[in-house]
Amino acid sequence: MNNTNLILENARDWHVVGLIVQGNPKKLSAIQTALLAIEHTEIPTLDEKLGKFVVVMQSNDQHLLLEKMESVKDIDGVINVSLVYHEQDEQNK
């Protein structure tokens, strides 16, 4: 088991957010690559015509998750980032 798994296993709570990321249609491939380079981030769907991604991010640390969300705004070609969903799963230990 690696360190990431140990940290996640011992986490007291887990946060999941859903984002809509709008980008320049000419830069979608680079935006997608940059998004997928962020740990615990996935792209369930993409509308290439509108230049919009549905992005799911997860973390056991809400501050780290906020940093990840803020970093998306700095990706070249990103126009707008909207938070559309947040869930916190608290573990009872």
UniProtKB/Swiss-Prot annotation:
Q: Which domain of life is it from?
A: Bacteria
Q: Where in the cell is it found?
A: Cytoplasm
Molecular function GO labels:
signal sequence binding
Q: Which Gene Ontology BP terms does the record give?
A: negative regulation of protein transport
One Pfam family this chain carries? Answer: NapD
Which keywords belong to this entry? Chaperone, Cytoplasm
Q: Where is the signal peptide?
A: none
Cellular component per GO, a single term:
cytoplasm
List the InterPro entries hit by this protein, alphabetically: Chaperone_NapD_NO3_reduct
Record-linked PANTHER family = CHAPERONE NAPD
**What is the role of the protein in this entry?**
Chaperone for NapA, the catalytic subunit of the periplasmic nitrate reductase. It binds directly and specifically to the twin-arginine signal peptide of NapA, preventing premature interaction with the Tat translocase and premature export.
- Hey, which family's this protein in? Belongs to the NapD family.
**Quaternary state and partners of this protein?**
Interacts with the cytoplasmic NapA precursor.
This chain belongs to the protein called Chaperone NapD
